[in-house]
């Protein structure tokens, strides 16, 4: 039965997205979606915490791709598995196979700056469908995703969309927020216009979520810098802040190894940062304490997002500027390492 269904799907005539009839409503949805992509891409391109953001956004993107493969796995489960951190009151993921096996390679690929033409990366022979020459670039990208999804039953097709968008010129670099799709593309269930509309809506919502994550991360960076600038004896708080940008989940033992201090001293340092609202303890009733940054805690649903009007950013000062510059130099060094692979 499975073979016959597959044969029916592969041989059924399908109208490509690039040839669907346009309505004013669909044009408006496409315009809003392209604007959302452009806004996120512009912010990420100019942000000094782009690499740190990619790590955080990759949890959500990978979780989306897993759910499209019918895994009942949420972002917090991806985070827990990748950092080796059991989340209190949350059962471990029970699933067959190795759902996280492709994550590391995918994350590395998000930093790929090779200039391959997008057609060279497709695992199938591509022929331009009807309406291709006059279609907007985003519609072309979704058309490729549509074709790809029926030729590749693995998670790779959903994870490949960020790089495809970058190679087609939609974004300056692969954005993990664009790891998405729709199972209906494989089964051809439902009207094609409805499938396209769902994809456009998902892209817009993911980009808006990506901007919110970036806002929280940049605010966390400013708040941490303000705390350090206001301390008479900051000690290794600054080093902890730099570490947390790329490793948002930390323990006293891990900090001890990375910063060259005693476990006891690292525990006190983390407790000090937690008292100032920069970290939250998530270890529960265990013999070792684990902390994550407050902005990551909000993204994972461990912490509630603050309500009301956000507080004003700390006023400029020489001390604050010096700390922010040090953070930025650290991120630039990390970016160079990632580019080298």
What spans do the regions from the language model cover?
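FIC/Doc superfamily catalytic core
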Residues: 1-341
């Amino acid at each position: 039965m499975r073979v016959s269904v597959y044969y029916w799907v592969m041989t059924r005539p399908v109208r490509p997205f690039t040839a669907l009839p346009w309505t004013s409503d669909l044009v408006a949805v496409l315009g809003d979606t392209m604007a959302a992509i452009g806004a996120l891409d512009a912010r990420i391109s100019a942000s000094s915490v782009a690499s740190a953001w990619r790590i955080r956004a990759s949890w959500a993107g990978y979780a989306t791709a897993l759910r499209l493969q019918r895994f009942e796995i949420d972002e917090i489960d991806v985070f827990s598995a990748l950092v080796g951190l059991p989340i209190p009151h949350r059962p471990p993921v029970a699933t067959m196979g190795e759902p996280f096996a492709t994550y590391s390679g995918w994350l590395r690929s998000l930093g790929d700056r090779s200039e391959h033409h997008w057609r060279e990366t497709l695992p199938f022979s591509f022929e331009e469908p009807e309406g291709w020459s006059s279609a907007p670039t985003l519609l072309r990208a979704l058309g490729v995703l549509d074709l790809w999804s029926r030729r590749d039953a693995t998670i790779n097709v959903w994870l490949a969309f960020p790089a495809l968008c970058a190679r087609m010129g939609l974004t300056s670099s692969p954005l993990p927020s664009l790891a998405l799709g729709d199972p209906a593309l494989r089964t051809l269930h439902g009207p094609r216009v409805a499938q396209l509309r769902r994809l456009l809506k998902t892209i817009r919502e993911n980009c808006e979520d990506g901007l919110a994550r970036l806002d929280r991360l940049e605010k966390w960076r400013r708040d941490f810098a303000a705390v350090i600038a206001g301390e008479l004896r900051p000690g290794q708080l600054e080093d902890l802040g730099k570490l947390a940008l790329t490793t948002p989940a930390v323990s006293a033992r891990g900090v001890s190894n990375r910063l060259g201090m005693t476990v006891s001293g690292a525990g006190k340092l983390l407790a000090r940062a937690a008292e100032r609202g920069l970290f939250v303890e998530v270890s529960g009733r265990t013999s070792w304490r684990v902390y994550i940054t407050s902005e990551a805690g909000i993204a994972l649903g461990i912490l509630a997002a603050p309500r009301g009007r956000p507080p004003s950013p700390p006023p400029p000062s020489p001390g604050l500027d010096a700390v922010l510059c040090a953070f930025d130099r650290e991120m630039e060094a990390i970016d160079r390492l990632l580019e080298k692979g």
